[in-house]
Amino acid sequence: MKVMSSVFLASILTIGSAFANVTVAKEISPAKSVDNIQMNSQQELVDLFFAAAKIGNSEVINEFLKHGFPVDVRNKDGYTPLMMATYYGHQAIVSSLLKHGADRCARDNRGNTALMGALFKMEFAIAKQLRQVDCDAQAQKTGQKTTAEFAKVIGQEKQLQKLIQEQEKAQAKTQK
């Protein structure tokens, strides 16, 4: 069953791209360019990747990543799949994306990070995972909100402080 599932997912990637080209090919007028057709099929793949991150479909996410799909691809709002998986509470997807090099410090069009999304949605286990890298140094340079400022605005500053203290204790134990 697992082999069949993997074959099915791989075929989605291949057929999805081909289907998009065939579907658009029917509507080609002399004014339409090959670049537009290719952009449409690429956008469909991006949409599928984001949908998988949103609903927590780790099989689709892992299949895309296995075939070299860009882990930090963005949608029109500047969200990354990491932000989407975080916001919807899919810790397994978050772990997989991080393992494949997802940028924890990426900011959306409003200047928010995945960690901010985790705090907003009270996904503290995911927040703990994301907080392993401090992304605030760059925020201070660019005039964007730091995680602490964001946490204060949404009333989660105590949770953030607790998270930071837990991580500091864990680091102190490992250094001994």
Please identify what each model-predicted range represents.
Residues 4-5, 16-67, 168-176:
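Intrinsically disordered, low-complexity regulatory segments in ankyrin-centric signaling systems
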Residues 64, 97, 130, 163-164:
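Conserved hydrophobic site in ankyrin repeats
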